[in-house]
Swiss-Prot record:
NCBIfam families, alphabetized: rpmJ_bact (TIGR01022)
Pfam families in the cross-refs: Ribosomal_L36
Lineage: Bacteria, Pseudomonadati, Thermodesulfobacteriota, Desulfovibrionia, Desulfovibrionales
Family membership noted in the UniProt record: Belongs to the bacterial ribosomal protein bL36 family.
Alphabetical UniProt keywords: Ribonucleoprotein, Ribosomal protein
Domain of life: Bacteria
MF annotations from Gene Ontology: structural constituent of ribosome
Protein name (Swiss-Prot/TrEMBL): Large ribosomal subunit protein bL36
HAMAP family given in the database record: Ribosomal_bL36 (MF_00251)
GO biological process, one term: translation
Coiled coil: none
InterPro entries: Ribosomal_bL36, Ribosomal_bL36_sp
Length: 37
């Protein structure tokens, strides 16, 4: 899980979702998981 000021899709399978007011990127590649901090 990377914590970043700006989250972006890394690959076509990444999805940007909002969970409890926090932007997250979920992907089948665990290295692409991100959260806005």
């Amino acid at each position: 899980m990377k914590v970043r000021p700006s989250v972006k899709k890394v690959c076509p399978k990444c999805k940007v979702i909002r969970r409890k007011g926090v932007l997250r990127v979920i992907c089948e590649n665990p290295r692409h998981k991100q959260r806005q901090g």
